[in-house]
């Protein structure tokens, strides 16, 4: 398997190495594995093609990793550092939106560019009017369960209000999260 990954990298570089938008590469997304191996792979990638920036993983939940860059990382993709959160999810669970804070405290001692991983992902109430649009394997069992639950509780008439209110909240949370990132001088970017 490991040799396949090295070979796959070689094929990617051969096919896309000169593409102008190929400027960064991660070994994978949310990897939980042997980080010595991942660092070795990044070292190999840098030796093979040094024209771009590399990172071991686009975030990880692996214990002992993910709060600071790995030794071979040219950039760091995470939800938090060892100093705190760099994405709203962990902050907005603890405090209300305030629109004047940033992520500077969590960025202290960061020696490579940092990108916040998968910001947002705020839940919005489903639009139950869309149920009939789904057919075949796309049957919206989750939407149907929500509809049945609302009907059982006598709240079905509120479904559109729930949709609108949750959508407005998601907009406010995205707005603050993106503004916090943009206000943080050391911040390098974010992924939606």
Residue ranges and their predicted role:
Residues 25, 86-90, 94-192:
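Substrate-binding clefts and catalytic carboxylate motifs of secreted carbohydrate-active enzymes
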